[in-house]
Each structure stands twice: as structure tokens, then as C-alpha cells.
Regions:
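An edge-strand/N-cap motif at the start of beta-rich repeat modules
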Residues: 1-4, 16-18, 30-31
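Conserved beta-propeller blade signature
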Residues: 2-3, 47-48, 93-95, 103, ...
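Short loop/turn segments that connect beta-strands within beta-propeller blades
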Residues: 15-18, 67-70, 106-109, 151-154, ...
């Protein structure tokens, strides 16, 4: 199945082969909430997702646990709004809220295990950085510009590292190191054991979205807001240098570069889907769809590729053969399913 959240307030499960709706759940019935900003957590029988109404004063949010096959609500945990991914260590799951609170829930019934509030105001309604797990620890970068490490079981704070700048990407983990971008225009590598800075790389623009880690490399989207341009870069795990750069105008709208058959897939709000060779960044092909392309999903290296547009279309898209030339526009083999807008 293919799971997708609509910012019209419904969470869907599609048959990935036909696009037919297997089940859906309208979250409006549970209060003033509309959006799904984080990636779900999929277990053997459940799918967990957070909801929110941005920072609306009367808005709420939940963590939902749906039965993966039927869409039945197994449990839900109410809070002020959960726009982050859901992380997991064994029988405990973790998420963060717009109120800069990190909390842990029991996977079985959604009961609160522990909660840690940073106590930092969020006047600009920024999305919190999702918590990530490293072994039995949870890392979280708060709005107070501090990265903290917690014991996943007890919630005890183990260490903290003042960054002096805001995290602008999700944290990505390799071994015992956390990688992320900051509002100072840098990539950082920090030890998950004690918060020690292990590496730092200045960037030509602001890092954003989610970092892809593959082939001992990091692939990162950058945004130059002044010039309304975007970059896709590759660097190594030691952050010693930028290995290649690809520029786009307008900037990228998809959350992160998606790896597929050795290619990096990236979309923008002109409906352009681009494929770059991951080894050297050389463009391989591009195509034009309709809408602002926000999410790109794959099922391994197989086809089709699943693409969500902000205007409300989900595409099951068959890419051109790998031997096709750049800018081939002849493939219109996408099936569309209109189901509200996706962010």
C-alpha cells in the first residue's frame, strides 16, 4: 500500500498498483487539525502519524496509531500539534510538538511514558526538528538552539550542546554521528555519545529539508532565498569538501533528493522532475508534471515512482528508460488520483 496525508485533513492508504483508496480517515472529526507534516512510522501491523493545525491558537494535534490493513484507530494521543516524524526504540515511540516538547509514548496503547519541555517560545511557528534515535538514546534539537541527548527509556538528559544557531534540516544518523544543517549556512557532524563537534562544512546557501545518506556521502538541498535558487550538493562523511553542486531555479520543493537506480530525483514548484547521477551530479533526464512537487517515494529501484503534488495530485509515474536523453518529454505514463493537497 501507499500511505499519504492530505492537508485537507484525511490520511489515505492507496493500492499502490491501481491508485484505488483502500481506506481513509478524516481527522477533522477529532478536533481542529488539518495537516500531516512528518513521515509516518510503519510497524508490522500499525502505521503511526502526527497531525497539527500549524500554530493556530485553537488548533490541536494527535499522534495516531492506525491499523495498517483496515485504518481502524488503535489509539490516539492528543497534544498541541505534532509535525515531526515518529521515531522508535523497541516498544516506545518518540515525537515533538510545536510547543518544543519531546515526548515518549508506549507503542501498545499510546500512554505517555515521559515528556521533556524545552520552554522556548516559537513566535515564527517553525517546524520542530524530528527526534532521532541512536542505539538506546534519543537526540533532539530544540528551538533554544541546543542539541540534547536523552536516555530513551527514562527521558533523563545525558548531555547538551549549545549550537548558537538553529537546525534547518532533519538530523541524519551514520554510526554514532548526527549530521544536520544550520541557519548559519553550515553542515555539522556531532557525536551522539557526548555532543562533541566532529566536523563542520560552510555552504554557499541555507541547508534545508532532509539529508540523504548513501554511498558514504551526504546529499543535501540548499536554498538561496535572495536569488530564489536552489542547490543540490554532495559531500563526504568527514565534511571535508563539497564534491559537486547542481543549481536549480526555482529552488527545490521536494523534501529531499530521493535515490533511485543510482540517480537522485528532485522536484520543484514548476512541476519539473529532474534526475541526476549520484556519483558526479551530471543530469540524466527531466520531465514535466503538473503542480508543485512535494514528495517523491520509491519501492526500491522498481517502477513506478510515486509523486505527491501540493495541489492534490498523486502520480504513479513510470520514468524514462535509463538510456533516454536528457529533457525527453515524451513520457506521459502517469496515473493521477485527486485526493486533496499534500504538504
Amino acid at each position: 500500500m501507499l500511505f499519504i496525508g492530505s492537508c485537507a485533513g484525511t490520511f489515505y492508504a492507496f493500492d499502490k498498483h491501481t491508485g484505488q483508496v483502500r481506506w481513509g480517515y478524516n481527522i477533522h472529526q477529532d478536533g481542529n487539525q488539518t495537516s500531516f507534516h512528518g513521515n509516518p512510522l510503519i510497524s508490522e501491523s500499525l502505521i503511526l502519524i502526527g497531525t497539527d493545525k500549524s500554530c493556530a491558537p485553537d488548533g490541536i494535534g494527535h499522534v495516531y496509531a492506525f491499523d495498517k490493513a483496515t485504518g481502524a484507530v488503535r489509539w490516539k494521543y492528543r497534544t498541541v500539534g505534532v509535525p515531526t516524524d515518529i521515531a522508535q526504540i523497541g516498544s516506545v515511540v518518540y515525537a515533538a510538538s510545536f510547543a518544543d516538547e519531546l515526548f515518549a509514548l508506549n507503542l501498545e496503547d499510546g500512554s505517555l511514558r515521559w515528556k521533556f519541555g524545552m520552554g522556548t517560545a516559537n513566535p515564527d511557528c517553525e517546524l520542530p526538528s524530528p527526534p532521532v534515535v541512536v542505539g538506546k538514546r534519543v537526540l533532539y534539537a530544540g528551538f533554544d538552539n541546543v542539541l540534547r541527548g536523552f536516555d530513551g527509556k527514562s527521558g533523563r538528559e545525558l548531555w547538551q550542546r549549545s549550537l548558537g544557531t538553529h537546525a534547518t534540516t532533519r538530523l541524519s544518523i551514520v554510526g554514532k554521528s548526527a549530521y544536520f544543517g544550520t541557519s548559519a549556512g553550515r553542515l555539522l557532524r556531532i557525536s551522539a555519545d557526548d555532543g562533541r563537534i566532529q566536523g563542520e562544512l560552510p555552504l554557499p546557501a541555507l541547508p534545508e529539508g532532509r539529508i540523504l545518506i548513501a554511498h558514504d556521502s551526504l546529499y543535501v538541498f540548499l536554498e538561496d532565498r535572495e536569488r530564489r535558487a536552489g542547490y543540490l550538493i554532495r559531500t563526504n562523511l568527514t565534511l571535508s569538501q563539497i564534491q559537486w553542486v547542481q543549481k536549480s531555479s526555482p529552488d527545490w520543493s521536494s523534501e529531499w533528493p530521493r535515490l533511485w537506480n543510482g540517480l537522485l530525483l528532485a522536484g520543484n514548484c514548476h512541476g519539473e522532475l529532474n534526475a541526476f547521477r549520484s556519483s558526479d551530479g551530471v543530469p540524466q533526464w527531466s520531465d514535466k508534471l503538473k503542480g508543485c512537487l512535494r514528495s517523491i517515494g520509491t519501492d526500491g529501484d522498481g517502477a513506478p515512482i510515486y509523486i505527491g503534488a501540493q495541489e492534490g495530485t498523486v502520480y504513479a509515474y513510470s520514468p524514462p528508460p535509463l538510456t533516454s536523453r536528457l529533457d525527453s518529454r515524451s513520457h506521459e505514463r502517469a496515473t493521477e488520483q485527486q485526493q486533496g493537497s499534500k504538504r
